[in-house]
Amino acid sequence: MDEKDWILLKILHEEQSVTKTAERLFTSQPSITYRLKKIEEIFGIELFTKRHKGITFTAEGEHLVAYARRMLQELQDTKDHISNLSKEVQGHLRLGVSSNFAQYKLPKLLREFSTMYPNVQYSVQTGWSTDVMKLLDAGIVQVGILRGSHRWKGVEERLTREKLHIISKKPITIEQLPFLPFIKYKTDASLKTIIEDWMHTNLKQAPIIAMEVDRQETCKEMVKHGLGYSIAPEICLQESDHLYTMELYNAKGKPLMRDTWLMYDQKSLGIKLVKAFIDFLKGEQMVTI
């Protein structure tokens, strides 16, 4: 078995489907099946059993997957160590970043960091903050940038702090909200709770949900076309949107805030590249209150 086989087993275990594994590896299903049969022949085992939808790994298959994960981690650790021996900052930086931060902030940051350290390559995985948290816990990424609060055993530092706003095409008042169409969007549990709690406290009746869309950016476009109002964090608002915005306050009269957190393992600071990136982020002074 080599690195390609380790990756194959790891992804197959994640997907529990030969078809989806082939799609992720950009190869054909027959070639995946052929390689899996070769692995089974080498060890004289069955890796998995087929079921109506997908597959189920055997005990022997689970053992080989665990071995593949260990070998991939050892290989990555070796690559990191060798890169770290160089006097210059170089190597492969593995980042897990929440979708919103990745869309609105990350490109500019990576461009600036790449200008400072041109010999750095990036592996960036984006998604819900809960998914990024799983990547951190599994050691798949070295640095996580997450929205909202999460349990983390390592270092956790606030990177940004922003206000939440009501957004609409034209000026509106809080008293009008129960009678206006509300555009809801899918988001992580922490932001969803903040918004729902505020509405429960400040609106005399439940909002009229006109539609529910998949992303904040889609929601914002609907609002820009006058189809309703919504509540959004400052990170996604631009002057060019030409939207009416109203800050939200809690019962104590303080602005409702949305935090973005920088998370990493303390041991990762021993890697020049990771330390350089973390120091760079801290030097950006992105925290706003």
Swiss-Prot record:
Domain HTH lysR-type: 1-58
SUPFAM superfamilies the UniProt entry points to: Periplasmic binding protein-like II, Winged helix' DNA-binding domain
DNA-binding region as annotated in the record: 18-37
GO biological process: regulation of DNA-templated transcription
Alphabetical list of InterPro entries matching this protein: LysR_subst-bd, Tscrpt_reg_HTH_LysR, WH-like_DNA-bd_sf, WH_DNA-bd_sf
Any Pfam family matching the protein: LysR_substrate
PROSITE patterns cross-referenced by the UniProt entry: HTH_LYSR (PS50931)
Keyword field contains Protease: no
GO molecular function, one term: DNA-binding transcription factor activity
Gene3D superfamilies recorded: 3.40.190.290, Winged helix-like DNA-binding domain superfamily/Winged helix DNA-binding domain
Family annotation (CDD domains): PBP2_LTTR_substrate (cd05466)
Keywords for the protein's UniProt record, in alphabetical order: DNA-binding, Transcription, Transcription regulation
Sequence similarity: Belongs to the LysR transcriptional regulatory family.
Name of the featured protein: Uncharacterized HTH-type transcriptional regulator YraN
Organism: Bacillus subtilis (strain 168)
